[in-house]
Design a protein with these regions (language model features):
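Transmembrane alpha-helices
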Residues: 11, 16-23, 114, 132, ...
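Transmembrane-helix boundary motif in ABC transporter permease subunits
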Residues: 1-5, 70-102, 115, 119, ...
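Interhelical loop and adjacent transmembrane-helix boundary motif
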Residues: 2, 34-36, 49-57, 199-250
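N-terminal, non-cleaved signal-anchor transmembrane helix
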Residues: 1-56, 60-63, 67, 248-262
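A structural signal for multi-pass alpha-helical bundles of membrane permease subunits
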Residues: 21-34, 64, 114-124, 192-198, ...
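Membrane-interfacial helix termini and adjacent extracytoplasmic/periplasmic loops
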Residues: 37, 41, 46, 95, ...
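C-terminal transmembrane helix and the adjacent membrane-cytosol boundary/short C-terminal tail
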Residues: 2-11, 21, 150-161, 165, ...
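Hydrophobic alpha-helical transmembrane segments of multipass integral membrane proteins
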Residues: 59, 63, 67-79, 83, ...
Length: 262
């Protein structure tokens, strides 16, 4: 093994450690019987999980997060599919500008998007409501859905759709019988990935949620001015949920590629 390979592996290990070590520490301290995050641990306990599960505010925030994440996933995936299919099927003047605008939100700092959303929703009179969080998260996540589905469409054999047309199928019927089944793995991946992004998103939700707090916003309220071990427990649950959704999305893509290779 060359020195370059060793250096690259060491660098990769540092990156992985930098990302996941704080998460592991949070998981570890979520079972610590001491109130303060110190080593050595005072002992093993599930008290902090029992505390949050008995907290009605936690369950309300969890319900809000689940409603927002599931609604966002459906809307973002639907918009992403429509945009991806438009890019795949049609050519029109201004198409490059159209795609640039669609893919713009991930490149804008979240604080700017949050302030713009807050001002816009306040003007519409819907600031602080669940639909406003869903709308904001849809804007944030739709570009990811579009990218996933468009990548899948780039792999389709165009003769399949042409064969459907030759057999008398309308464009809508060809889409339902050819395009949608072909894109099903990407659509499934998009649903889980956008749900994970929405479930874990804090900055925009903090500005537009008002009294309808999501779990990340609820965590911020807990940590303000105090050290509360509940934060480690809630953070562990949020991370586990988000990672589960992401892993499911990756698995859908992986197994589809495996079946194609076979």
């Amino acid at each position: 093994m060359s020195r370059l390979d060793l250096a690259l592996r060491f660098y990769l290990a540092l990156i992985v450690g930098f990302i996941f070590l704080p998460i592991f520490v949070s998981l570890l301290f979520s079972f610590n019987s001491d109130r303060f995050p110190t080593l050595p641990l005072g002992g093993f306990t599930t008290h902090w999980y029992q505390t949050i599960f008995a907290d009605p505010d936690f369950w309300q925030a969890a319900r809000n997060s689940l409603v927002v994440a599931s609604s966002t996933a459906l809307l973002a995936t639907a918009l992403g599919f429509c945009t991806a299919y438009t890019d795949y099927r049609y050519s029109f003047r201004g198409k490059s500008l159209f795609l640039a605008i669609i893919l713009l939100p991930p490149t804008i700092p979240l604080i700017i998007i949050a302030l713009a959303m807050l001002a816009w929703f306040a003007r519409l009179g819907i600031s602080g409501q669940i639909p406003s969080i869903i709308a904001a998260h849809t804007v944030l996540t739709a570009p990811f859905a579009m990218a996933i589905i468009r990548l899948r469409l780039s792999q389709i054999d165009e003769s399949l759709e042409a064969a459907a047309w030759n057999l008398g199928a309308s464009e809508w019927r060809a889409m339902r019988s050819v395009i949608l089944p072909f894109c099903a793995p990407a659509i499934g991946s998009s649903l889980f990935l956008t749900a994970a992004v929405s479930f874990d998103e804090f900055t925009v939700a903090w500005f537009v949620s008002g009294l309808n707090k999501t779990l990340p916003v609820h965590v911020l309220e807990i940590v303000q001015g105090t050290i509360d071990p509940q934060v480690n427990a809630i953070g562990t649950l949020v991370f586990a949920t988000s990672m589960t959704l992401v892993l499911i999305a990756q698995a859908l893509i992986f197994f589809k590629l495996q079946r194609r290779a076979a």
